[in-house]
């Protein structure tokens, strides 16, 4: 996920590249969460733990692992579900989230920050849909094309 977000660097004035103002408590909590881990880490001090009973969603305050593919980009959810940078104590910007979804940097999302977040998270990644449509068109035209055999038994 690191290469996807950092290569090439996103321009400072890029569209949809607005940083979220994190509360001091969120910043302090993020300092205890390692890349690839989430808010349920046992290392987090008691005063920074989430006071949630029952469900423990795996993506709450989850940091990206810079050396692995991203986890699912979501379009909604409460606090702590915005996807978090592996090193910096902050949520990803919508432009960074759009890159994870394979949108080109010149693709402009219209609307407020949460509306744009939803558009990105609810979208089918452009590169993914391209593969699907190419396979569909080749199948409909009875063309041979490269494929991978299913491993379902």
Describe every region a protein language model picked out.
Residues 3-153:
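C-terminal target-recognition/interaction regions appended to catalytic cores
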